[in-house]
Each structure stands twice: as C-alpha cells, then as structure tokens.
C-alpha cells in the first residue's frame, strides 16, 4: 500500500506522518513532544540521527540529520571548502559542520505556508534526500 493511501481520509499532523514512516521502515524513534521526533536511521556507512520538528508559526517542517565527525583541525579548511562546493550543488537543504559538538549536519525545511499539508511521499522523500545528500558529500571527501 502506498504511504499516502493511509492518509486520504483526513489531514494528519506532519510528525504523526513521520512516526508512521519510521514504524514502516522499522527505524528507532522517540516522539520527543507533539511537534518533534528523533530517529536513528541505519545507512551503508553509518547511523544517522534525524530530528524533525514542526513549527506551526513558520508553517515549516524542519529536518536536521547529523552524524559524529571529528576531523583534525588542520583539515577543517578543506572540509569547509568541500561543504561550500557540495552546497552549491544541493538544490534542497544544506550542510554545516558544528565544530563544538563535532557533528556533520544536513538541514532542510519544507515550507507549507497557506495551510498546505505535507504528504507522506514528500516527507519520505525529504528523509531520503538527507541520505542521498550525504552520498554527494562522501564523493568530495579527500
């Protein structure tokens, strides 16, 4: 059954959809609060930590995907240059490196202004795009 077939009858909170997707894929998750969920997603190279949060004020579903990374300090300039190159090629989302906690970060916001609702396919694609984007980043590692 397609993901959206289960939600045709009624509009549903975006985080409820994310929770359903996590259950469907058998990902570990924690519903932190009504508007936020955290998940661990196993991929080929590592486990990614994903957090999705809904802001009704901004009408945006925000995804933050991270993994731990502690490059040597002398490699940070090369890392930042690679992030700039990859961000130039990313049509959606963008990468940052948070030095203090040692996290590589991919961020994406799905704007749903005007009372729009996210479909399960949009959210599933949004989550998948994070993993695909990390593939592009790996291609730039030196």
Describe each model-derived feature in a short phrase.
Residues 123-127:
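Hydrophobic packing residues in well-ordered alpha-helices of helical domains and bundles
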Residues 111-120:
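Well-ordered alpha/beta subsegment
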Residues 131:
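Long, contiguous binding/interaction regions
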Residues 20, 24-63, 68:
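Ser/Thr-rich, low-complexity intrinsically disordered terminal regions
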Residues 104-108:
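Short, aliphatic-rich beta-strand segments
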Residues 66-103:
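Short, internal acidic amphipathic alpha-helical interface segments
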Residues 135-142:
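Conserved small/polar residues in nucleotide/adenosyl-binding loops
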Residues 1-14:
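Terminal, regulation- and interaction-focused segments at domain boundaries
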